[in-house]
């Protein structure tokens, strides 16, 4: 993704929107001369809204990892496709989705995947102080309510 972006920029393209497999890389502005507006999918089953929230991007990348699309259902239990590297077993987490903004797709995708296997508290501790990473979490609490948390500058350009 980042190679495609750089290749197009070298050839004079200024306003770019590239999406491959859920990773997004934007440059410049949309056709109305404004920042690109990207929808973050709702991880809530049977939700009336398919978009949970939107974020504006300018000259940045966005990647989202979630447990709501790729899972195995066995005996009424959803088994997450994210694997804990320490145990080799599927992660059990209340985190439903993590979206990461970064200056490139490589970092955004890697951090979205890494944060997906951590709790919110573990994840926010890992990325605090990293200026190039902003993140947005969607998770469920112990009562099944859907909540969101995000870093200070996630919604800023």
Predicted regions: what is each one?
Residues 1-157:
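Mature catalytic core of soluble alpha/beta enzymes
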């Amino acid at each position: 993704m980042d190679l495609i972006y750089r290749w197009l920029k070298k050839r004079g393209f200024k306003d770019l929107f590239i999406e491959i497999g859920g990773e997004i890389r934007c440059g410049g502005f949309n056709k109305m001369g404004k920042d690109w507006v990207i929808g973050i999918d709702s991880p809530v089953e049977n939700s009336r809204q398919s978009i949970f929230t939107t974020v504006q991007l300018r000259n940045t990348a966005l990647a989202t990892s979630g447990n709501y699309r790729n899972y195995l259902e066995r005996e009424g239990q959803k088994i997450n496709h994210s694997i804990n590297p320490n145990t080799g077993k599927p992660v059990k987490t209340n985190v439903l989705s993590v979206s990461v903004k970064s200056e490139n797709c490589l970092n955004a995708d890697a951090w979205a995947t890494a944060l997906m296997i951590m709790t919110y508290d573990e994840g926010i501790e890992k990325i605090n102080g990293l200026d190039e990473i902003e993140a947005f979490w969607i998770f469920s609490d112990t009562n099944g309510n859907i909540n969101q948390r995000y870093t200070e500058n996630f919604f800023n350009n």
